[in-house]
């Protein structure tokens, strides 16, 4: 999708976490095949949306540099204590110029090229508040992927209230709203790097 004065979907790259299992390193800036993970994701996410935001609480200048080719804007959490992806979602929903926000984590370099379209189709068909990706493996086991989701920005005030009340679990907040699950069979597309070991494994895939 191309940028427009009234975008319909805002893309949100979630890059604001602590990365405790990577010794606090900024995950989105770690290299895979010589390229920062965040840039891999931006290259896949941005063509699917009308505008792009990057949720980043550290290294804002570096993320702005990575996001420049996509006209991405940087947004930070409203609180400084790294409360988790819900806070990044809220920042993105507040900053979005579109009525829908499609989020993806910064450490998933293989995300599907049609993830936003499929989430949007399901959201629209079910008149849902949230559409969330779920992977299904060869044994039919389902694995929710809550940070791959499409959400209505009209939920921002409710999310702010939930955060103020101490909610930190993404799926728990989703459960308060009409959420549709969208199945994806390609597990590889959702592989991520929560640790140095997983980053090394990504490089071998």
Curated annotation (Swiss-Prot):
Keyword Cytoplasm attributed: yes
Protein residues bound to GTP: 14-16, 27, 77, 107
Gene Ontology BP terms: bis(molybdopterin guanine dinucleotide)molybdenum biosynthetic process
InterPro entries (alphabetical): MobA-like_NTP_Trfase, Molybde_CF_guanTrfase, Nucleotide-diphossugar_trans
Keywords: Cytoplasm, GTP-binding, Magnesium, Metal-binding, Molybdenum cofactor biosynthesis, Nucleotide-binding, Transferase
Top-tier EC class: transferase
A GO MF term: molybdenum cofactor guanylyltransferase activity
Pfam families named among the record's database cross-references: NTP_transf_3
Record: residues binding Mg(2+): 107
EC numbers on record: 2.7.7.77
CDD domains registered for this protein in UniProt: MobA (cd02503)
Known catalytic reactions: Mo-molybdopterin + GTP + H(+) = Mo-molybdopterin guanine dinucleotide + diphosphate
Gene3D superfamilies, alphabetized: Spore Coat Polysaccharide Biosynthesis Protein SpsA, Chain A
Major localization listed first in the record, in broad terms: cytoplasm
Similarity section: Belongs to the MobA family.
Record text on subunit structure and interactions: Monomer.
Stated name of the protein: Molybdenum cofactor guanylyltransferase
Organism: Burkholderia ambifaria (strain ATCC BAA-244 / DSM 16087 / CCUG 44356 / LMG 19182 / AMMD) (Burkholderia cepacia (strain AMMD))
């Amino acid at each position: 999708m191309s940028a427009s004065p009234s975008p319909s979907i805002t893309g949100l790259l979630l890059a604001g976490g602590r990365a405790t299992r990577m010794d606090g390193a900024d995950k989105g800036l770690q290299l895979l095949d010589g390229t920062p993970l965040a840039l891999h994701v931006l290259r896949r996410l941005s063509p699917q949306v009308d505008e792009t935001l990057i949720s980043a609480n550290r290294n804002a200048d570096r993320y702005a540099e990575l996001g420049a080719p996509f006209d991405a804007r940087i947004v930070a959490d409203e609180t400084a204590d790294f409360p988790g992806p819900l806070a990044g979602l809220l920042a993105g929903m507040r900053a979005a110029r579109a009525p829908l926000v499609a989020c993806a984590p910064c450490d998933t370099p293989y995300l599907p090229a049609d993830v936003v379209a499929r989430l949007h189709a399901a959201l629209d068909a079910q008149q849902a508040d949230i559409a969330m990706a779920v992977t299904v493996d060869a044994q039919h086991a389902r694995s929710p992927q809550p940070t791959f989701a499409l959400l209505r920005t009209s939920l921002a005030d409710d999310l702010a209230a939930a955060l103020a009340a101490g909610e930190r679990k993404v799926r728990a907040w989703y459960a308060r709203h009409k959420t549709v699950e969208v199945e994806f069979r390609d597990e590889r597309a959702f592989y991520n790097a929560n640790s140095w070991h997983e980053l090394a494994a990504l490089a071998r895939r």
